[in-house]
From Swiss-Prot:
Has four distinct domains: an N-terminal nucleotidyltransferase (NT) domain responsible for UTase activity, a central HD domain that encodes UR activity, and two C-terminal ACT domains that seem to have a role in glutamine sensing. The lineage of its organism: Bacteria, Pseudomonadati, Pseudomonadota, Alphaproteobacteria, Rhodobacterales. Its cofactor is Mg(2+). It holds the Pfam family GlnD_UR_UTase. Belongs to the GlnD family. GO terms for biological process: nitrogen fixation; regulation of nitrogen utilization. It comes from Cereibacter sphaeroides (strain ATCC 17023 / DSM 158 / JCM 6121 / CCUG 31486 / LMG 2827 / NBRC 12203 / NCIMB 8253 / ATH 2.4.1.) (Rhodobacter sphaeroides). Modifies, by uridylylation and deuridylylation, the PII regulatory proteins (GlnB and homologs), in response to the nitrogen status of the cell that GlnD senses through the glutamine level. Under low glutamine levels, catalyzes the conversion of the PII proteins and UTP to PII-UMP and PPi, while under higher glutamine levels, GlnD hydrolyzes PII-UMP to PII and UMP (deuridylylation). Thus, controls uridylylation state and activity of the PII proteins, and plays an important role in the regulation of nitrogen fixation and metabolism. Keywords: Hydrolase, Magnesium, Multifunctional enzyme, Nitrogen fixation, Nucleotidyltransferase, Repeat, Transferase. Residues 388-741 are annotated as: Uridylyl-removing. SMART domains: HDc (SM00471). This is Bifunctional uridylyltransferase/uridylyl-removing enzyme. The gene is glnD.
Length: 930
């Protein structure tokens, strides 16, 4: 029985615009003839042998076709539409050849009965003729009635051949009635049937299924189908992280991904029986411009997905960090001065994902207008909002424009509608969004500098509660970038590191939202100082504008703080700020990282650090503004970035700086701090013999009393009491204020002690987040390390005894740290592509006593040990280490002296040490790659 061909794939209009002519992909007719001829020439064969001939020839044809497609796509890496159709055409050829071999040679019937008919249909994505290189092949074997033994043998033989071709086949054998029943019961099956496509076999049977589905299943059930698909979409988004700007998006299932576009097409097809997405225009669901946006996004996303499949050799849809670099290179994105190609690629990705969201909104609005889609239940929550201004109307609980012509006659309305939405609490109707997006050209230079327009924008930031929703919608529609052209450059800009969870524009909006939450007393417990500052009063105009502009200089070769300040100098006056306010905004943008850097990269227990910071901020007013900006900036990076550790550092720096500004810089002297610490220790150790207490207070040098808490001084006093010369005492204790475990060590002093301790901690898998070491006048050393587990959390109390034992063994020489660390120095594969140039700086001004060596490089296990071992080998004494981690990047700041107790002033000494530190970093990085 030869398959019917009058409606087969060769004539399907879906296959126009293939990336290669069909003959160069696979000539199905020629392949089938060749297989049949070889089987015939071999004489009588058992089914297995005949099948082997077919599989061998089909394997060769499949390999040749795939090779041709892969090479062509490599040369034309954006032509995804032609590729996915070509992949489907190649699969069609293999499936139809397998059917003919099964029907005509393996299980031939001279006079088939009516029951012995079979139609083979493609369903799902394959039915749409959209296949990535490693997509599944979903087949429906359709029979008139209950499956016959002959049909069962044909299907089994086909499947064996297709499996032997290494195709991932999903299949079902059903009658028309089965399809109808199962389609009613299961929305996933119904969706797959919606996209059925006849391949080969008995064409009338396939036509019967088509008519039955449309007449008896799809008709009259549109609202039910829409609700199910939108519910499915919501659940899918939730599984994928719930937002568009995730670090490693899923190109198929993620928000703004291919599945969202396919959902629009499914709904349009279900309601209007459109044969392809272009039919959505004729159906009135999308405009021509919107459909072009649909096509551009779809082509881009399919290109990404196909490159993912080729790069991994399997069906991969997640754009992990390592694959982002490879796909960007495959698609022709190159590094430029100031930006990596992968960052430009991901910016394009997020912009397309945003447009998919816009299309979804206007599409669903059209359905609501036709009453195809039920009004959202949530709209009932908005019934008691403020009354709208007369130029607006309420449609399905959302603000729409009453008269589009009158609305556009005053271009400032393109801003006013967002203020109205904030003022009333209503959402903006997608129809109004469509009107705005189509008229962005009205936002010209004149409007950008218009005093009233800027007043409206500033009021939006300041007057109506949290402006987050309005800013995000303005950004997605292109209004924000049009009104502030300098902002356009950072829209959807990705920063290729693990630290920043959001694109630059989304980070900015998150920062402003955090500020609004603090103002509304929603974060009082978490952010007491920021809350108090805002309650006492600062310039709201200055802080909101500074937050809006603080990262506006990103994405260029220059330092983004310096460039951002220059941009702020131009932009801030447009908002109507006074000269003094503009100067303050410029200063805040220029130094928006200063407080964070001081708190996280310097020893804030050193009075010199606080004095230098106080000199930089100069006034309590600027300190307050910078503190609030810093808190919002860190919290806006992403979930989990703000923690007790950072909060404590910033609070201490703020309080000490306030003291310095109020009482004078001289108030920050070591003697005062030492006296206070000793007085507190006397109270904590009041049960001690006075002679022992005097000895403890006298045995330490002044720096010991500066940076440690009173409780830690008490711990060390007890550890040092009666300590033998060969004894090592270890105390591990949770420090919830720092989100870490405090590890205290007391032992006899010797060179390289910091390195030994760092190695022992690295060996047990501890991440060091801060450390201090001190020597006593009688030859002992005290060291405190704050450590976290591999998840960035304090160790569970139950693990501390075993951890103590493991550290003790390492320190006693039972384990050699460097050798044992070899197998632990590996980078995670997904993070291996992050590149951070190493910067090493020597600072002799930041501390009165020590040279500060700042090492900014790629983080990895064992790095701190390698650096401290190198310093120890060069006779450098380490007093403390401040570790600041930013995702895969780390800044280790070491407070050091040479063997004579002096700073490292000599240039040649610095250069030699820098060379050796760089060598240690390079050698460690090589080990990590192996």
């Amino acid at each position: 029985m030869a398959p019917a061909s009058e409606a087969g794939p060769a004539q399907d209009p879906l296959f126009s615009g293939l990336i290669l002519p069909r003959s160069r992909i696979l000539d199905a007719e020629a392949l089938t003839r060749s297989i049949l001829a070889e089987i015939d020439a071999a004489g009588p064969l058992d089914p297995k042998s005949a099948r082997a001939i077919a599989v061998r020839q089909m394997t060769e044809a499949k390999a040749a076709g795939n090779r041709a497609l892969s090479e062509t796509f490599e040369a034309r890496p954006r032509e995804a539409r032609g590729l996915i159709r070509a992949q489907a055409a190649l699969t069609d050829g293999l499936v139809t050849a397998a059917l003919r071999v099964a029907c005509e040679r393996l299980h031939p019937l001279a006079n088939p009965t009516e029951a012995e008919r079979i139609a083979v249909l493609a369903v799902g994505g394959y039915g749409r003729a959209e296949m990535a290189p490693h997509s599944d092949v979903d087949l429906l074997f359709l029979t008139p009635w209950k499956i016959t033994p002959w049909a069962e043998m044909v299907i089994e033989s086909m499947l064996y051949m297709l499996w032997d071709l290494r195709l991932k086949v999903g299949h079902s054998s059903r009658t028309v009635k089965d399809c109808l029943r199962l389609g009613r019961e299961d929305i996933t099956i119904r969706t797959a049937l919606l996209e059925h496509r006849f391949l080969a076999g008995h064409a009338p049977l396939a036509a019967e299924l088509d008519e039955t589905l449309w007449n008896d299943l799809f008709r009259g059930t549109g609202a039910e189908f829409i609700d199910a698909k939108l519910e499915e979409r919501g659940q899918r988004h939730k599984r994928q992280g719930g937002q568009r700007y995730v670090l490693e998006p899923n190109v198929k299932e993620g928000k703004g991904g291919l599945r969202d576009l396919q959902t629009l097409y499914w709904i349009g097809k279900y309601l209007n029986r459109v044969p392809s997405p272009s039919g959505l225009v004729a159906a009135g669901l999308l405009t021509r411009d919107e459909f072009e946006t649909f096509e551009r996004a779809e082509s881009f996303l399919w290109a990404v997905r196909c490159h993912l499949h080729y790069a991994t050799g399997r069906a991969t849809d997640q754009l992990t960090f390592d694959l982002q670099v490879e796909v960007a290179a495959r698609m022709g994105y190159a590094d430029t001065r100031g930006r990596r190609g992968v960052e430009v690629f991901m910016q394009d990705y997020f912009r397309h994902a945003t447009r998919v969201g816009e299309l979804t909104r206007v599409f669903l609005a059209q359905l609501e207008a036709r009453h195809e889609k039920r009004e959202p239940k949530i709209m009932g929550l908005f019934r008691r909002k403020k009354r709208l201004k007369p130029e607006y109307s309420l449609v399905n609980g959302r603000i729409d424009v009453l008269d589009p012509k009158a609305f556009l006659a005053d271009k400032l309305n393109l801003l006013r509608i967002f203020e109205e939405a904030l003022r009333t609490g209503f959402l903006i109707h997608p129809g109004a969004m469509r009107l705005i997006a189509a008229n962005l050209h009205l936002i010209d230079e004149e409007m950008q500098h218009d005093r009233e327009a800027n007043r409206i924008f500033l009021d939006m930031l300041l007057r109506h509660g949290n402006p987050e929703r309005a800013l995000r919608r303005m950004n997605e529609l292109g209004v924000l970038g049009a009104f502030i052209p300098e902002f356009e450059r950072i829209v959807a800009m990705m920063q290729f590191n693990v630290y920043h969870h959001y694109t630059v524009d989304e980070h900015t909006i998150q920062c402003i939202s955090t500020l609004a939450q603090i103002e509304r007393h929603e974060l009082d417990e978490e952010l007491p100082i920021a809350n108090r500052i805002l309650t006492d009063g600062i310039s709201r105009r200055v802080i909101y504008v500074a937050l809006l502009l603080h990262d506006i200089g990103k994405g260029r070769p220059e330092d983004h703080s310096i460039l951002g300040a220059q941009i702020a100098r131009r932009v801030a006056p447009r908002f109507g700020l006074t000269a003094e306010e503009c100067e303050t905004v410029e200063w805040l943008v220029r130094y928006h990282l200063l407080m964070s850097d001081m708190a996280q990269k310097r020893d804030i227990g050193d009075p010199r650090t606080v004095r230098d910071f106080a000199k930089a901020v100069r006034s309590k007013k600027r300190l307050d503004l910078l503190t609030v900006l810093t808190v919002c900036d860190i919290r806006g990076v992403g979930p989990g970035t703000w923690n007790n550790w950072k909060a404590q550092l910033l609070r201490k720096l703020y309080r000490d700086t306030v003291t310095a500004l109020d009482a004078g810089l001289e108030s920050l002297n070591r003697e005062n701090r030492a006296d206070e610490a000793k007085r507190a220790l006397r109270e904590l150790l009041e049960e001690w013999d006075p002679k022992d207490l005097r000895a403890e207070l006298a045995r330490h040098y002044p720096p010991y009393w500066q940076a440690l808490s009173n409780a830690t001084h008490a711990v060390f006093a007890r550890m040092l009491r009666g300590l033998g010369e060969t004894e090592i005492r270890i105390d591990l204790d949770p420090d919830p204020d720092r989100d870490a475990t405090r590890a205290c060590f007391a032992l006899a002093d010797h060179p390289g002690i910091f390195s030994r301790l760092a190695g022992a901690l690295a060996l047990v898998g501890a991440n060091v987040v801060d450390a201090r070491t001190y020597t006593t006048k009688d030859g002992y050393a005290t060291a405190v390390f704050w450590i976290q587990d591999s998840e960035g959390s304090p160790y569970e109390i139950s693990r501390l005894p075993r951890l103590t034992s493991m550290i003790d063994k390492t320190l006693k020489g039972e384990v050699v740290a460097r050798e044992a660390l070899k197998d632990r120095d590996k980078l995670k594969k997904r993070e291996a592509q992050f590149r951070f140039p190493t910067h090493i700086a020597f600072d002799n001004e930041g501390s009165d006593i020590y040279t500060i060596i700042e090492v900014d490089t790629r983080d990895r296990p064992g790095l701190l040990y390698d650096l401290t071992r190198t310093l120890a080998a060069n006779n450098i004494y380490i007093a403390s280490a401040v570790i600041a981690t930013y995702g895969a990047q780390v800044v280790d700041s070491f407070y050091v002296k040479d063997m004579f107790g002096l700073k490292l002033h000599q240039k040649n000494r610095q250069e030699t040490l820098e060379k050796k530190l760089r060598q240690a970093i390079v050698e460690g990085a090589e080990r990590a790659k192996q």
